[in-house]
Every structure is written in structure tokens, then in C-alpha cells.
Amino acid sequence: MTDVLLPLAIAVPIVAATLPIALGLWFDDVGWPIAAVATTAVVGIAAAIAAEVALGGQFDHAVGTYQPPIGIELVADQLSAAVLVLIAVVSLATLAFSRVAGPRGNPFYSAYLLLVGGLSGMALTGDLFNMFVFLEIVGITTYALIAADRSGASAYASLKYLVVGTVGASLYLVGVGYAFLATGTLNMVDMREQILAQAGYGDPLIQASYALIVAGLALKIALFPVHTWQPDAYQRAPDAVTAVVAALVSTTSAYALIRVTYTVFTVDFLAANDAITTAMLVVSGTSILAGSVLAAMQSDLKRMFAYSSVAQFGMIGAAIALANETALLGGIVHLIGHGLLKFGLFLGVGTLALGYGVRRIEDAASAAREAPFTAGAIALLGLGLVGIPPSVGFLGKWYIGVGAVESSMAGAGPAGIAVAAVIFVSTLFTLSYVARLIERFYFAGVGLSGGHGDDAAAGHGDDSAGGAGDDPAGVAADGGRDDDPAANDTGAAAPVAPVEGAPRPSLVPDRVPPASLAVLLVTTLVTVSLGFAGFALAEWFGPFLTEVFA
């Protein structure tokens, strides 16, 4: 009976999403408690699914009366269970921050729960068409959440993401259609068998199908050069939304790419189509370098870490394309670790903005003196992003690099060595901007401004987004530069009147909400702890890797 947990992980948040709107007709402020209860339930369900996978291995559930491959199938294995746990934990943790930072309102929490349900569905679905359905649920709710700030800048960023995301979803759907024409099935496992038995890896329909699916998911993941929606969306979204989107949305799209590549098309398809794998490696390598360089050019903290994501997902893309077991292990570890790191970093940036109005590196002078816990957590998470051992960021990069070298030594040519070199160069760029931030935290001489309120918390549900105003022109260009008009006018966040829920000035270090600080510190502790779990992670993902490389 444990297989019923799989539909529950999806149904609970989606059904709960109707309640804030329905009960909101009679009661105010019911959205947060409903969302908290629902996401807590999802955490429990995800933990139970992971425990079942640990004890008994992969299991599945057929939805409805039709059995697979005709019916809808949900599947839990080591990879999907790990991603589901990440989704559940980050979703619940984000609510603790949104309670004080916003956005607020019943419609926001309904959209948030739909997002959680869509992400859970992407992690568990066993067929390609339902992957598209859940991908669309995630996309539509993300567009709404990014625009929850109700400013012109956030609305523009949301519209930009909507256009790009729609193109990506359309390409994915066309690719699935081609695969269906070639195989006559949508079930992932059955399609893998039909490709081998009927179509073959050299079938033009199969090749076009994979190319279109990869292109569509690359838009969703935000690989260079189709990354342009991401910096604006991350910068202009409310802080709580940025944290959950950065940690989960691109992460689940990258998970979908791993799942489609290795469960449906298999490693043999990659070996038989050198042109496709070469193109993937070129795009991934370019994304690694371009994202790192553009991140190093930024002053706005959210924009800097947004470009960093372009580089980090490029590493995951390279790990997928290398078709090497060690590299794929690194890609999966980096997928989970990067999600946690970016959640913590954006949560830390939002906490600084809420407590002190800090949004740019130059405004973060001596943050360690006035906000030692917040600054320390951001510094540790930043070093994890660089890949300093023993962080989880180091583990992922190490496995990818070792796998890349193994690939070259096994006769794959110089591509693997090139990937390892690009990752090394990217690490140097990452160190440059993280070190610049840490230098401002610990060695600059001017204290924090200490502003609170609407502008300080930029985009927490009121009518401002980092002082951007209602002019979308400030975010129209994506040339790797900051486009924050307010910051250019003043150079620092001006103190404003406090709002309800904002912390009041005191002599206590880190005058920020205790809940958000606690979540930040726990996230930091988890990322550091995972850095010591290299063998445990390799053992956990071992059965999945053994299956796909058998």
C-alpha cells in the first residue's frame, strides 16, 4: 500500500491550493496556515517515500484503472526520491521566510501550493506527456509568483519568462510528439524498449525528438545563450519567490533532462550520436564560462547569483552529455547541492534586505559586524558555491571533473579534459566574486544602512522591487550589467519607515526575524554536512547509476 504515497505527494498540495481561495471568501489570512500544513504533509510523504526506496528499492503506482504503458504511471527511485525530498524541504522552509518577508495574500499561497504540486509531479511522473503537464503547471505558477510583487519591473520579468518558457515548453512537446510517432508510446520505460526494438538510435525522428526536448529544457534550465529570462526574474521577484525558484524550478527541469536522457534515450543513444553530445558539451561549456564571467561583473547580489546559476547548470549539462558514470554522479550531487546552496544564498540576501536594506555588494560593508550570523552563513554558502572542501559544492564539481578526465582517458577524445579545464576556470571566477563579497562583509569600514520596510524588503508583496519602480526599461537589456535604477541614483538603500512584521532596531546582532535566520543557519549546516557524505551519496544513487549504465 505504500505506492499510494506517490499520488498523495502530488494531490495533497494541488487539492490544498483550492482552499485559500475558497475559504478566503469568508476568512482573511488563511493562506499561510493552509500552505504550512500542506507542505508539512508533503515533507512527511516525501520522507516516507525515500524510506521505502531505501528499504525496498524502486516502486511505482498506476493511476486509475489502466495499467502502464497505457495508463499513467508514477515512479519513485533513488533519483526521484532525492529530488522530491529537496522539493518538500525547501518548500516548507520558504514558508517560514515568507511569513515575515511576504508576499502575503490567499492567491499567493494558492499559486505556491500549485507550484509544489507541479514540482512533485515532475519528480515522480513516469511518462513524457505528463512531464509536460507538470512542467506547464510549474511554469504558469512561477510566472504568477514572480509578478506577485505587483511592480512594473517584476511584471516585465514575469512576461519575459512567460514568453521564453512557452517556447521551451512547446519545443519539449513537439519533441515528445516525434518520439510518440516513432514508438507509439509515452511511457518512459516502454519508450526506451521501443526505441531499441523498432526505431533504433539512428532514426531521424528519434534524433529530432531528443534534440527538441533538450532545446526546450535548456530554455527552462536557463543555459547560455537562452538564459536571458533568469537574471531579471531572480532580481525582480519577491525574495521568498526568488529563493524557491532558484532552488527548485531550474533544478527540476535539469532533473527532467537527466531522466529523459538516461531513462528514455539511454547512454547508448548518446554514444551513437556524437554530433548531439558534442553540441551539448559545447553549449554546456559556453554556459559555464559565460555565466561565471557575467556573475563576476555584477554588483546586485541577486543578479550575481542568478548568473552563477547559469554556470552551475552548465556543469550539470556537461555531466549529462559526458555519458560517464562518475560524471553523472557528480551532476546529480551538484543538482541537489546547488539547489540547497542557492536556496540558502538567496534566503541570506533576502534576510539582509529585510533587516538592513542591503541589495548590492558595495552596500554590504562590515555586514559581519552588524549581522554576524547572516553574513557568516552567506560566506560559508558562497565558499560552498566556489567548491571549497568539504562543502557539497566541492563534491559535485570533483565527481564531474574526475568523470570528465575518465571519459577522455577511455578514448572519448579531448572533450573531457576541456570540460575539466572549463570547470577549473569557472571556479576561479566564482572565487573572485565570492571573495569580493566576503571582503565587503569582513574588511570594509562603513556599517550597514539599517533600513527597513518596503524598499528594504524589496518585493515582499508590496509595490516595490528593489526600488525599480514601474519602468520595465531598466530590465530590458541583458548584457551582463546591473540595471537597477534606484541603486544607480543613490548608491545605497535609504532608510524608510518600518512595516508590520519587520524587525525593529536593537543592540542584538542580526536584527532580522528569528525564523528566517534559523532556516538560513540550518540550510548552511546541511550543505556543510553533505560535504562529508560523499560515500553515502554515491551509495544512495548507486542503484540508479547501475541501472542506466548497465
Regions found by a protein language model. Give the residues of each.
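Transmembrane helix-loop-helix hairpins at membrane boundaries of multipass inner-membrane proteins
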Residues: 2-96, 100-110, 461-479, 483-488, ...
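Structural signature of hydrophobic alpha-helical transmembrane segments
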Residues: 1-15, 76-87, 128-141, 207-219, ...
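Residue-level recognition of transmembrane alpha-helices
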Residues: 9-13, 38, 87, 112, ...
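Short aromatic-rich membrane-water interface segments that cap or initiate transmembrane helices
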Residues: 2, 64-82, 193-210, 273-278, ...
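Alpha-helical multi-pass transmembrane bundles of energy-transducing inner-membrane proteins
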Residues: 23, 27-30, 107-110, 114, ...
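Interfacial and helix-entry/exit segments of alpha-helical transmembrane bundles
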Residues: 108-118, 156-173, 190-213, 232-250, ...
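Short helix-boundary/re-entrant hairpin motifs in multi-pass inner-membrane proteins
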Residues: 65, 213-279, 306
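Cytoplasmic/organellar membrane-interface segments at the starts of transmembrane helices
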Residues: 237, 371, 436-550
